[in-house]
């Protein structure tokens, strides 16, 4: 992972496969463990004890930018910006098929799955409100391979697995996602490592 250090924040380009903080079955090799080791006490202590500097999170299987607060003032200001939605969170996802309509807004509730507590699911009435705005950037079609779409997703809320759940619920599962996929979706002659 790459890192940019400033007086009051760190900006980390997190790789896929790394958890933000320790949790069940994964107590080492997390962003928090690395921050504690390399930043020592130069992190904010606002919030939960075992999440120093952590203002927001992204899923373990997601790569992307994480902003980490080095002091309490920056932590509080960043938290307020996330709460007031003045920081844009934009992600790119490669999905199976053509997403219909090509752009739109997904608004519903997301809750823990009753079948598997490690997964989330869409609900019409229960859970936390979740809003994802999306637009198709490009469609990849060929007579000899499946159709894929590159989709830009802009979050208004930040729920666990939000993009994965929303796109999966539309029938456009993220390529390489092992948790929210249909069993018949296989990539022929392509190494799934390319999609991590």
Predicted regions and their residues:
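RNA pseudouridine synthases
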Residues: 1-2, 6-196
């Amino acid at each position: 992972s790459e890192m940019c250090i400033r007086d009051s924040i760190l900006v980390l380009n997190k790789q896929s496969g790394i958890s933000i903080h320790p949790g069940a079955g994964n107590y080492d090799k997390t962003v928090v463990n690395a921050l504690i080791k390399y930043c020592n006490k130069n992190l904010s202590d606002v919030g939960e004890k075992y999440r120093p500097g952590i203002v927001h999170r992204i899923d373990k299987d997601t790569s992307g930018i994480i902003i980490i607060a080095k002091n309490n003032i920056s932590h509080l200001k960043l938290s307020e910006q996330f709460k007031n939605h003045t920081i844009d969170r934009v992600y790119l996802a490669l999905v199976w098929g053509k997403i219909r309509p090509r752009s739109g807004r997904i608004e519903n509730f997301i809750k823990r799955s009753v079948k598997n507590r490690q997964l989330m699911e869409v609900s019409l009435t229960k859970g936390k409100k979740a809003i994802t705005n999306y637009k198709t950037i490009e469609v990849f079609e060929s007579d000899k391979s499946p159709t894929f779409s590159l989709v830009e997703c802009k979050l208004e809320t930040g729920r666990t697995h939000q993009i994965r759940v929303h796109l999966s619920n539309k029938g456009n599962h993220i390529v390489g996602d092992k948790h929210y996929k249909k069993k018949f979706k296989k990539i022929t002659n392509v190494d799934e490592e390319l999609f991590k």
